[in-house]
Amino acid sequence: RALYVSLHHSAPALAQAAAERALGHKSLFFCQSRSLTELVAQRMSGLHTEVFVHHSSVSTEERHAAEERFHRGQNVCIVCTSTLELGIDVGDLDQVFQANAPSSVSSFLQRMGRTGRRAGQTANTTFFCETADAVLQAISIIELAREKWVESVPQKTRCWPVMVHQLLALTLQFGAISAERCWSQLHRVPDFSGIREAEFLALVAHLKAQDFLFESGGLLSMGQKAERVFGRKNFLELYAVFTSPQLYRVETAGGQTVGSLEQGFVDRLVEEMSSFLLGGRAWKVDKISHSDRVLHVSAAPRGQKPSWGGFVPQLLSFPLCQRMRRVLAEETVYPYLDDASQRALADRRADLGPLLARGGLAIQLDDTAARLWTFAGGCINHTLKYALEWTTGWRVIADNLQLRIEGDGVQHQRVEAALGTIAALGFWDDSGTQRALLARLPEYRLSKFQQALPEAMALEMVGEYLLDIEGARGWLTAAAARSI
């Protein structure tokens, strides 16, 4: 394997370095967001490599054209999101680039696996990082892959939004169907094996009360609200489980569809003044037609990167974050780092290494807050966050590596005591605890069918994505043992 991790402190510098490395080769450049994809592609354009963009908001025609021209080219780079991680054949490939780091070992292996397929060629990935934390994440992913560790696929047994989808699909298939027949067909599916019949019937009752389902003569059919929400274009929304936000088609004067933008971004655009990036090119807004949701555009010399909504935090796994902790605590030299990455790693080790080496809780204090370095991953940290906020009244900000705790009297001993409270026997098993945590969850939109669920089931779905109660309990037990 040929691996290289480099550090560049801005997206333009990152794009410049990638363009130099791409020269004369066929490369795929993976980015973690559509916005960064557009910015990097625009910065790479004009630097002697033919650059294309590939993500879900670029039109199908543009994506197919990029794939075809990439097949034929020799000095080409497609800047893309995970749309090119699997399945799509773009032919022989020389290099894979990664902006910052992917969120999982499996993604890294899939992306690197696009190279090294020709005789005599070596599989390779070059990481172009913007921050020291991205360097740390890239190292940890590489080292876990070297150890032949990869994430397991968790089995879900209470998939409420899919249950709603299947219920509506059955009414569409049969016209009218009894709840008993629906249950007999669905309860055998592994994704629903954790749902009891009484819970299923409660869901059906809610869907009837909200007019998503209509019952007559003991048979269920689609309610008027379901037809309004999901019935457009011959129930197209029921044939696609994934959510699509309200989109505006971006079209040139010649009728070419460039791609699509979300309404939230379009609402901030001004005719004859605003410009934006899409498909790696800059476009000026000529006219916005709200009635048919079309944005009429012409070429522009420059533009701003678009924003796409639906923010949901990128949650890293516990094993990956623990590997990041180990990288900081050890003195291992990684030969695939450039000089800037080596210096950034040395700085992070100097900052956190002594704290981690002491054992016990890794807490840093400043004038206004305490930082608890858990390296426990996003789900465990968010679980700890909501438990601490509920029991102490403090404000807690969680990411994958740490909790920032703000409030009156936040000191080392009080943080230890608060953790002792939520580590107490029976705390996590108490139904009041679980209700309190679920009540604090943000209203993340994870599925188009979420709106049809009762509140408790919708909160459970968000909680399953964001929380890990067993993991939090395990981390607290281990932390208590280290503090003895």
Q: Could you say what each language-model-derived stretch is?
A:
Residues 55-56, 153-157, 220-221, 293-298, 394-415, 429-434:
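A generic structural motif
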Residues 13-21, 70-81, 197-200, 206, ...:
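Phosphate-interacting basic helix/loop segments used at nucleotide- and nucleic-acid interfaces
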Residues 149-271, 275-282, 287-288, 364-375, ...:
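C-terminal accessory/connector segments of nucleic-acid motor ATPases
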Residues 6, 249-252, 298:
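Short, acidic/hydrophobic/Gly-rich beta-strand patch recurrent on exposed beta strands
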Residues 342-410:
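C-terminal accessory regions
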Residues 1-174, 178-225:
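Helicase motor core with emphasis on the C-terminal RecA-like subdomain
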